[in-house]
Every structure is written in structure tokens, then in C-alpha cells.
């Protein structure tokens, strides 16, 4: 099972937004480049980096940080405001192959195929709040059945998703794996679970679901609990495979 540390960037700094709300932003006095380098040295093979400024405000203020982080691009899945082929290609030229996309894919599913044509490995971000699918930096929502949506996107080459429970994101509440498990099994896609991966109990449950889904639950993304030391690097490594 993959355990993926998460680093969100806002105003050029490491940050977390509780439930995805800008007014509930927590900033951390951590250097993002040093943090990523240390995690790779500790043996983590994948780091989740999201440009919140670009996702929410369509701002390029974090680009200098992304350029510095590109040294470690092979270990990073990058997301946040990837809504055009031009921007995806710009990130690809920096070395970022694994890119997280959402809003543009909901508007135009063929975007998945277009990304593969420029050697990008797209990962769809399925963000849910109370059973509704959210997009545009979680500022908009729509009543869409997640499983039906994913089955349709598979026709365009979808293979893997990140499923975030927005109501749990950044709250340190426990992730409810029942919906994540249902999505993985019924849609037959690989899933990284996010939002509420907040304790060792979360990791134990994830490991159990990983086995029950024959690996379709590929792993978990750990954000605030990691940044605040609630889940230490040592504990996360214990569950990482």
C-alpha cells in the first residue's frame, strides 16, 4: 500500500485549507523543497503536491516553487488548476509527468486522451462532499453519481483517481472508507484515498481495505496529520509498501 505525504502550496508557502475553504487556511513554517527532499531520503516514492493558488485563484504565484521542486519531479504527482493542455505541457517540460486533473475532465473527458498524447499520466481527482461531486477548486458542486461518472471516464482511458472527502479534509477527522471502497470495486479503478487520513487507525483501516479490494485501494494521502506530526514519518513508513 502506498502512503503518500501531501504538501499544498498557497501564497508560496506550505499550507492546508480546512474543508477546502480559503478562509480556513493554516500556514506551516516549512520549506517545501527541503520537505520534499527529506521525504524522498526517507524512502517515500510519491509525494502529493497541490498548487492551491492556481486551483482557486488561477494564480501563478507558486510557479517559482514548482520550478525548484522540479528537481524531484519523478517522485511528485502535481495538481491544482491544470485546465489546459498548454499548462499541462508546461508542467511536463518541468518534468512533472503524473498530473492530477478534475474540472477540465468533467467539461471535456477527451482531455484525458489529450494528456496522454503529450506523455502525461493523468490522475482524476474525484472530490466529494455529501455525495455530491465538487470541482473548480471545490467552489462548485453537482449532483453526479461517482461510479457512473468514473465508468464513463474509463472510456477515455481513466485508470486511477484520488478520492477526497472534502468534509474531512484538513479536519483530522477519520476518513470514511465505505464510499471509497464502493467506488474502487464498482468502478474498477485504482484509488488513492484522501481527506481524514488522520491517525494510525486510518492507516490500519486502509491496509484492510487495500487487501479487500485486491489492491484497487492503492494507498492513502496524508496531509495535515503528517505536517503536524500526528502521523510521524516512522509510523507512515511502517504501513508503506
Swiss-Prot record:
Active-site residues, Swiss-Prot/TrEMBL: 8, 127
GO biological process: L-histidine biosynthetic process
Subcellular location: Cytoplasm
Record-linked Pfam families: His_biosynth (PF00977)
GO molecular function: 1-(5-phosphoribosyl)-5-[(5-phosphoribosylamino)methylideneamino]imidazole-4-carboxamide isomerase activity
Pathway in which the depicted protein is active: Amino-acid biosynthesis; L-histidine biosynthesis; L-histidine from 5-phospho-alpha-D-ribose 1-diphosphate: step 4/9
Keyword line: Amino-acid biosynthesis, Cytoplasm, Histidine biosynthesis, Isomerase
Gene Ontology CC: cytoplasm
Family that this chain belongs to: Belongs to the HisA/HisF family.
Subunit structure: Monomer.
Name of the protein in question: 1-(5-phosphoribosyl)-5-[(5-phosphoribosylamino)methylideneamino] imidazole-4-carboxamide isomerase
Gene designation per UniProt: hisA
Amino acid at each position: 500500500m502506498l502512503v503518500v505525504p501531501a504538501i499544498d502550496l498557497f501564497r508560496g508557502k506550505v499550507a492546508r485549507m480546512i474543508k477546502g475553504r480559503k478562509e480556513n487556511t493554516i500556514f506551516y513554517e516549512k520549506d517545501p523543497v527541503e520537505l520534499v527532499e527529506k521525504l524522498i531520503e526517507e524512502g517515500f516514492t510519491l509525494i502529493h503536491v497541490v498548487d492551491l493558488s492556481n486551483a482557486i485563484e488561477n494564480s501563478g504565484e507558486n510557479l517559482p516553487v514548482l520550478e525548484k521542486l522540479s528537481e524531484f519531479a519523478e517522485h511528485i504527482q502535481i495538481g491544482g488548476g491544470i485546465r489546459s493542455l498548454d499548462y499541462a505541457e508546461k508542467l511536463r517540460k518541468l518534468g512533472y509527468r503524473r498530473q492530477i486533473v478534475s474540472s477540465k475532465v468533467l467539461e471535456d473527458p477527451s482531455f484525458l486522451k489529450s494528456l496522454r498524447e503529450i506523455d502525461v499520466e493523468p490522475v482524476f481527482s474525484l472530490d466529494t462532499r455529501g455525495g455530491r461531486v465538487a470541482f473548480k477548486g471545490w467552489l462548485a458542486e453537482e449532483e453526479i453519481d461517482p461510479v457512473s461518472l468514473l465508468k464513463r471516464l474509463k472510456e477515455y482511458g481513466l485508470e486511477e483517481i484520488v478520492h477526497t472527502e472534502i468534509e474531512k479534509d484538513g479536519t483530522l477527522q477519520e476518513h470514511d472508507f465505505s464510499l471509497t471502497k464502493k467506488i474502487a470495486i464498482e468502478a474498477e479503478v485504482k484509488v488513492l484515498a484522501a481527506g481524514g487520513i488522520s491517525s494510525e487507525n486510518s492507516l490500519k483501516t486502509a491496509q484492510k481495505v487495500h487487501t479487500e479490494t485486491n489492491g484497487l485501494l492503492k494507498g492513502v494521502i496524508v496531509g495535515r496529520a503528517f505536517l503536524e506530526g500526528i502521523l510521524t514519518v516512522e509510523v507512515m513508513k511502517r504501513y508503506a509498501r
